[in-house]
Amino acid sequence: MAVPKRKKSKSRRNMHRSHCRLKVPNIGIDKTTGEYKLSHHVCLGGYYNEKQVLEVDSSNV
């Protein structure tokens, strides 16, 4: 079994774990509908960057 030759300091241990955390999703408000949406995603109304890119049935929304 592999064993470390020297003890890893608390600083180096924490730097090693710096990416191991929960990340907050990048949520913004859609300008056309006023609802929350993920950035760089199409909203439920079919809009992306204030332009309609998808035809959405009103019965599904």
From Swiss-Prot:
SUPFAM superfamilies, per the entry: Zn-binding ribosomal proteins (SSF57829)
Record has Ribosomal protein as a keyword: yes
Annotated InterPro entries: Ribosomal_bL32, Ribosomal_bL32_bact, Ribosomal_zn-bd
Keywords: Ribonucleoprotein, Ribosomal protein
GO molecular function: structural constituent of ribosome
Record GO cellular component, one term: large ribosomal subunit
GO biological process: translation
Pfam family name, one: Ribosomal_L32p
PANTHER family per the UniProt record, alphabetical: 50S RIBOSOMAL PROTEIN L32, LARGE RIBOSOMAL SUBUNIT PROTEIN BL32
HAMAP family: Ribosomal_bL32
Matches recorded under NCBIfam families: rpmF_bact
Family in the record: Belongs to the bacterial ribosomal protein bL32 family.
Protein name: Large ribosomal subunit protein bL32
